[in-house]
Amino acid sequence: MAGGVVILLCGWVLASCHGSNLDVEEPIVFREDAASFGQTVVQFGGSRLVVGAPLEAVAVNQTGRLYDCAPATGMCQPIVLRSPLEAVNMSLGLSLVTATNNAQLLACGPTAQRACVKNMYAKGSCLLLGSSLQFIQAVPASMPECPRQEMDIAFLIDGSGSINQRDFAQMKDFVKALMGEFASTSTLFSLMQYSNILKTHFTFTEFKNILDPQSLVDPIVQLQGLTYTATGIRTVMEELFHSKNGSRKSAKKILLVITDGQKYRDPLEYSDVIPAADKAGIIRYAIGVGDAFQEPTALKELNTIGSAPPQDHVFKVGNFAALRSIQRQLQEKIFAIEGTQSRSSSSFQHEMSQEGFSSALTSDGPVLGAVGSFSWSGGAFLYPPNTRPTFINMSQENVDMRDSYLGYSTAVAFWKGVHSLILGAPRHQHTGKVVIFTQEARHWRPKSEVRGTQIGSYFGASLCSVDVDRDGSTDLVLIGAPHYYEQTRGGQVSVFPVPGVRGRWQCEATLHGEQGHPWGRFGVALTVLGDVNGDNLADVAIGAPGEEESRGAVYIFHGASRLEIMPSPSQRVTGSQLSLRLQYFGQSLSGGQDLTQDGLVDLAVGAQGHVLLLRSLPLLKVELSIRFAPMEVAKAVYQCWERTPTVLEAGEATVCLTVHKGSPDLLGNVQGSVRYDLALDPGRLISRAIFDETKNCTLTGRKTLGLGDHCETVKLLLPDCVEDAVSPIILRLNFSLVRDSASPRNLHPVLAVGSQDHITASLPFEKNCKQELLCEGDLGISFNFSGLQVLVVGGSPELTVTVTVWNEGEDSYGTLVKFYYPAGLSYRRVTGTQQPHQYPLRLACEAEPAAQEDLRSSSCSINHPIFREGAKTTFMITFDVSYKAFLGDRLLLRAKASSENNKPDTNKTAFQLELPVKYTVYTLISRQEDSTNHVNFSSSHGGRRQEAAHRYRVNNLSPLKLAVRVNFWVPVLLNGVAVWDVTLSSPAQGVSCVSQMKPPQNPDFLTQIQRRSVLDCSIADCLHFRCDIPSLDIQDELDFILRGNLSFGWVSQTLQEKVLLVSEAEITFDTSVYSQLPGQEAFLRAQVETTLEEYVVYEPIFLVAGSSVGGLLLLALITVVLYKLGFFKRQYKEMLDGKAADPVTAGQADFGCETPPYLVS
């Protein structure tokens, strides 16, 4: 357990706190009950916060209020402003922005409304305030007048005979009612009735000149007749919409056609008149009355009469009484046309612009984002002083920008003396877009643009230009996409370098919030914070108000060299850290100014109903140094030859910290509470030195340090004999600043970027050499094969080599033994032997990468780092021997000893030895089951023969092929009498077989065969077959057959009835090269036995003849005996005679005996 503690203590490294630069212990909190207080916030004038509450109901038709919040008091006061009377419900404070010189503030209310007749327009309005928050002017100076668009509306009513008088009267009432809705406007009316006759009832001039215009409708009488609709449309275009009849050139021209059916016998087609009406800009509304328009052809004709698209310009009602039901709908569409300033009835220009949705103050004047301009394509208005405003957009004809909300966010970039305007369009093509505009020849034109990648991400909803190196030129543009969705986090901010800096405008990095907040809305608010970590680079803050179930969070990202933003946040401040009541913390941000007058920048964060001011912490920069005395550990201290542990003093270490401010502030002599940790030999299992004060390898303390130099001296001890005296003792210092309640203004300092929070110093050992820096080692090496005489590849899986290394010179540093061996061997393990009264043997061996295909090497470090003077060690290194290895007939193993002393090689530092090599094989020969096992014979058959076969199979189960010889011995003669006329069938080509006769080993066959009834080559003359197989491949299988006719004349010499006929086979190979697998030698030989058994043959003719004669004689004898006994005498007559003498008996006998039962009826 003690060793484990040492590991934990000596390997411990304290992480220093560089990251937290904002104070979250004592924030300044501003709270108001006003609706949406904290929706926007801006630092202003270096001493105050201006907070927007855009939804607060200030008075009737007046929404939005600004608050002046003083950090010194923690109180907020409403700012009394006089909003323009015509700016109804403007939501003042929905956007706030200050000038770079803090001299002006622009507060906007983009929902400022104005009612024009029946329409309500949202133009927006802003207030420009001075340095004392006094009103300077409204931007724009006044709300625009209601559009005075003139309209000339002509009625073309159907007077054909298909309409009855009552319906015609209802149609006239509809005309009068519609005319009445446009009373007191600049709208003029005219009316023409058509059938096959066309009649103008009143012109625009007549309508204009009469006091009671509706009296013009009452005298109208129905014409009756056919339906010439197309002709009527052309007549209206040519006559009513003519200046002679009072039609105005500046007025929009609207034609209302009321009909109950299709045209009939009209000489004109619609194709003759509709294109001309479109060209003249006449907006046509077609009203179809009755059931006729249920037919597709009639409906198609009605759609042709109306302008495109039909859903906006064609109406159908079931009867004339229902015309009133569409009156309001038609009226609203016509009013909408009156409210627009375009030729199209379905698009707006600036009527719904919502100027001030975003804003910026530039040297050229205020810039107001106008998201609603041109059907929410968007843009921005620049208001130069004493000049008409300039509208900046992608051009109103750019259909690609429809519903893009360009101007949703606004930022200003400055590069090489040129101002650029950056506008966000988060709904562009549903993925978002950001465009940079620059001024060329007094015209603002798009220079670069970048598009979002995810649908619904709202890419471009927030923008922030960043001057990273604070040289006055914009380096980066941060683009927020707060609704960007990933499975575990929501929102992202893309970092784009300004195009003028690095060419193309493309994303350089992407910033994200913490995992686990898919609805976090990271990036909804962005601000430049200033330098809070002392690296002279601008840092940024990013809000994520949706994190932690909408409690919210703010992230701090530091600027980096090369004009970048660090990809990981340095600090994350959550709303729940500050107060459990906070909601949407981070929905608005403002930074860069010192509002608390401590010389340090502050960050203002808006939440729901709250604004919090977070102060940045003072920075300290610390320089570290360590000095040792003496500068190395003396030999007398660390060497102990008898290994008797003695605690000796190694020296002293003086640790110094020099503290000064990391950035200027107004806090005076800042003091910091420092926690420091000293560790000796960190990372080692066992430290070679300890501190005298703690008696272990670590020392921890805490001190309060002010500005200046601070030093402390510690004593170092060596508690044990030092084996590694080559690498120096490492002393590592780690320290961190911890919070101290006594800090000025309750601000505890943190380390500035670039400040040291750790230092490492080395204390070397004095070398044991005659020359001060160079030791003369004298190494020697030898080895043997641990008693092994022959290496059998495949039989010996391992090769163990016993190695002896000695040093007859001075200390040898980094002693290394390198072994070189063939590729069939591989390093497996090493085992050392410990000698008494010696240092523990330390071995570390490893295989090295192969430099040659057929050569391998391994190296062993001996007693690293020092193999001392006079030392000698013996160890055993074991190699695996591959069963597939081919090593030739001898294995050569070489070894070389070397060190870092750089002494030249000698004949003692290299050694080599050879070992004979054999290869394990596994070949076998076996008998086959289909050999002839048993033969019966009879000596009476004389020279009759029988065929017999002995079958053998040769297999090679070795991992290599080899040349073998197969020998067969077959008995063929016994005492000169033929036994077996045998031949050998060889298996394949390439196998050559020869034969020769071999005399018996023991000619006294009779004695031998009586002892054991076996006929083999020991008593018989044998035929010896010798078959050479030059290459028996791996897994080869060869069959040999000994086949021939057996003779049995020799059997009588054996005096045996049963004899075993035995053939033998044997495999041989070059035993100087190969060795049969141990324990498998029996499979190199085999034999086949055939049992020969004699039987006696009997003649069947004599047996049959004798049996027949004997049977006849026996039959005759039996017959004579029966005759003598009277067996053949008849007694029937005597029986009849006996029955006649007894009538009764005779009658009964007659009936019972003479009459068979089956004849009775």
UniProtKB/Swiss-Prot annotation:
Question: Annotated motif GFFKR motif: location in the chain?
Answer: 1126-1130
* Membrane topology according to the record: Single-pass type I membrane protein
Residue intervals annotated with topology Extracellular:
20-1100
MF terms from GO for this chain are: integrin binding; metal ion binding; protein-containing complex binding
Q: Which residues bind Ca(2+) 1?
A: 467, 469, 471, 475
Sorted alphabetically, the Gene Ontology cellular component annotations on this record are: external side of plasma membrane; integrin complex
Q: Please report the residue spans annotated as repeat (FG-GAP).
A: 21-78, 79-138, 341-392, 393-444, 445-505, 508-566, 571-631
Query: So where does Ca(2+) 2 get bound?
Result: 531, 533, 535, 539
UniProt keyword annotations, A-Z: Calcium, Cell adhesion, Disulfide bond, Glycoprotein, Integrin, Magnesium, Membrane, Metal-binding, Receptor, Repeat, Signal, Transmembrane, Transmembrane helix
Q: Which biological process annotations from GO are given for this protein?
A: activated T cell proliferation; cell adhesion mediated by integrin; cell-cell adhesion; heterotypic cell-cell adhesion; integrin-mediated signaling pathway
Cytoplasmic compartment ranges equal: 1122-1161
| Annotated TM spans | 1101-1121
Q: What does this protein do?
A: Integrin alpha-D/beta-2 is a receptor for ICAM3 and VCAM1. May play a role in the atherosclerotic process such as clearing lipoproteins from plaques and in phagocytosis of blood-borne pathogens, particulate matter, and senescent erythrocytes from the blood.
Task: State what protein this is by name.
Answer: Integrin alpha-D
